[in-house]
Structures are given as structure tokens and as C-alpha cells.
Amino acid sequence: PTEPINSGNGMINNDFLTNTYVDANLRSNHIDAGVRFEYMQQPMPGFEPNFRGWGVPYGYVKYHDKKLEATAGTFYEQFGSGFILRTYEERSLGIDNSLLGAKVVLKPIEGVQLKALSGVQRTYWRWEKNIIYGADLEIGLEQFIKRMKEHNTYLTLGASWVHKHEKEELIMVDATHKLNLPAGVNAMDFRARLQTGGLNILAAYAVKGQDPNYDNKYIYKQGNVAMLSASYSQKGLSALIQAKRSDNMTFCSQRKVHGTAAY
């Protein structure tokens, strides 16, 4: 552009606007490593003001074999349907809420997978001081019930736990009263998925403790979400029906955060 434009984060008078990503990755039989350089000093129109910047916010080293995967550095993860933990990158929306820390994935026997992680979350160009801990367990019952496998039926049970520990901060409700904020908040997720032939059914439920935050206007109330999804597909035909109910289930690593990149 040759004329000043409103990019969504203020008027910009630059001849060159860019969101640039440069990835470098090395892979071997058991060890992977990678880094990513990002340049958004003059970002494309439509991105939030805090999106502007440049640097190397992403880097990792990973060891993996048939039963173990261990990652140190930055990584993305999702437990179940993502009700209590979902970190991901969506460049077209300006979202990258990766975790900086460590993650371990264990597969001790066929049909069992256990994940454990700890880290701090990225928000725009900074790493928050609040710490996230999490664990996830999935069991494929068809690996232990021979008749299920013989009839092409698969049943996966899953459970997740996430804890966020936030630093103490002062939030006033008026000139003389402050909020008594919890230092830690726990959340749990339970789910079951049944697949047989072209039928796929998923039921999931998650609950979290009292979590006063910007999104719920700092109320003291537990949150919960439930979802039931059913789909069927065969050649020339597919159908999907889904029901979901959510109550006070915003769950962010920092209580005062808002904006697109927070989610």
C-alpha cells in the first residue's frame, strides 16, 4: 500500500506489510529439534496491536521411540475435545498460545496412553509467569476385549486434569475492597468415544473450580460443560448431530487476559 491504512492496530504508513514465518527442523530416528523465526513488526491488516513484534518464540528438542516421547521447549497440546486444555497455532487469526516447558507421553502397553506436562503459556510476545500442570489418560478397551476388535468396534475412555497456578495480584472491586483470588484452579475432563462401522458417538463432560476472571466479570462460581455428538457415514451419505451446554467454562492461564490470542 502507498497510502496510510487502518490495519486494526492503528494507522500504518509503511510501503511493506508482512507476517513472516521461517521454520527450521531437524529429524532423526529418535531425536527431533526445531526453531521458528517470526517477523510481524509491520503486520497485515486485521491483527491486534499486541501482535506486532519479531523474534524466535518457538524452539524445541524431542526424543521419541515406540513407548516414550519427551519434549523440552515450546509445544502444542490438546486433551480430549479441548475443554480444559488446547494450545494451538492459527496464523490467519493471529493465535499462538503455545506452552514453554516440558511434556512426556508414555505408551506402556498397547491401548494405553498417558501424557504429563508443565509449562508457561505464550501471549503475543511474552511468556506468562503463571504455571500450568496437566495430565491425560486414554484407554482403548478394544485392545483388552477381543470380541470388540473382531466386530470392528472401538471404545476409548479418557480423563484429564489441569491445574493453573497464578501469581498473587491486586484487583479492587471498589476503593476499599479487593478480591480474594484463588492461587490455584483445578479442572477435570471425562469422555468416552464409541466407533462401530460408520457410527461414531462421543460424550464428554468437564468441570472446573471457582475461577474469577475477566471474561466472567470476576464471579465466584464453578464451571462445567457437557457435549454429546453422534455421526454416521457410508458411501454417498453422512449425518452429524451434536448438542453442547457450557456454563462459566472460560479457562485461561491468566485471569485478566482478553483478546483473540488469549484463546
Residue ranges with predicted function:
Residues 40, 54, 58, 75-81, ...:
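Acidic, small-polar-rich N-terminal luminal/periplasmic segments of exported/outer-membrane proteins
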Residues 3-17, 26-27, 31-33, 37-53, ...:
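Signature for the C-terminal beta-barrel architecture of outer-membrane proteins
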